[in-house]
Amino acid sequence: MAKIPAPDENGKPSNGERNYAEHFLDPFLKALEQIDVRPRIIDNYESYESGKFAEKSRIACEKHNEIRDIIETISGRELAEDWFPFNPYGHDGSLDRVTVTGFEWPYVYWVQDGVEGKSDLNKAEGKLPWRIDWPAKWGWVGVTCEPFGKDHGAAGGSYATGKEISKLFGDNPPHPLVYEWISLKGQGAMLSLIHI
């Protein structure tokens, strides 16, 4: 989202002065300001860029077999044979068709469409998959209580895997605060399932 230009007034990519994330975050922050809520914003892309995820990314890469086992055992789903707990950006800047071929701190080596490359874990040259990014963030941000929808709190859900991954990172997982889904009249339940 940080590299995608915000849409212009016609819905087309703009000149890139603002990115897609900023475009949709700004109205939300303005609405919060109207009710005197002033949150601390932690930009995920900037956090990767400044190296805040580097140590957790290193641990994830070094302990990729343990993380695979946690996810497969708790969630009950089998990960792809070439799965790796860090998704590097390929030569074209995307995550598509990128296969990790090795890891030696601070680099993850990869191949995309026959082109080989490496991504530095100290920079925003890739990211952790969401189920690993979430508990990684708990540790360095210092999260002590994490609210989430009941789907994330279900047996085998993302909190259950995140809790164990957090311990693998050497952190204490936050206390869970599970909430019910919100329903909008005529639209049914608003699920977070699409974000898993």
Q: Language model features by range: what are they?
A:
Residues M1, I194-I196:
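Intervening/peripheral non-core polypeptide segments
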Residues K63-D69, T73-I194:
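Alpha-helical recognition segments enriched in aromatics with Gly/Pro capping
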Residues M1-R68, G162, F169:
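N-terminal Rossmann-like or analogous alpha/beta NTP/dinucleotide-binding catalytic cores
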